[in-house]
Amino acid sequence: VDFDSESPRRPEIQ
């Protein structure tokens, strides 16, 4: 369910 381990619920928005 998690896109990024560092983000709670966000895709890679860098």
From Swiss-Prot:
Tissue expr: Expressed by the venom gland.
Domain of life: Eukaryota
Record PTM: Contains 8 disulfide bonds.
Subcellular localization: Secreted
Coiled coil: none
Sorted UniProt keywords: Disulfide bond, Secreted
GO cellular component terms attached to this protein's record: extracellular region
Other facts: Negative results: does not show any toxic, hemorrhagic or edematogenic activities in mice. Does not degrade fibrinogen or azocasein. Does not induce platelet aggregation, or inhibit collagen, ADP thrombin or ristocetin-induced platelet aggregation. It is not yet known if this protein blocks ion channels.
Family recorded in the similarity comment: Belongs to the CRISP family.
Protein name, per record: Cysteine-rich venom protein
